[in-house]
């Protein structure tokens, strides 16, 4: 990688499909907001989806061409929230350092379930700080090169 900034297409956020629940019951018609930021939050992309009548949601992949150099550590802040009874609830927070699809966890989460009444799980298992109210059964292997 060059020390001078050059444009590169990167995956800011992999697609995410799952089920949003509260005390085990699907939350329907609920807005899920995603904010992706980089360069110390001076640049960002924001979008949202609404859960369907079964509580399912599908956030699409977000790709963007950004200028990168060898002098700057690549890191994307991923924040996913919803609001319930007037309270903003953090569902997912991660600092993504991989530029590829499904680089967040090293694979595609299978059977992703996000339970608003659960405690936040905080871990460093995926090379970066990670907080989530979501669980999954397994990670579907995914390979790509950076």
Feature names for model-found ranges:
Residues 38-45:
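Short aromatic-acidic-glycine turn motif
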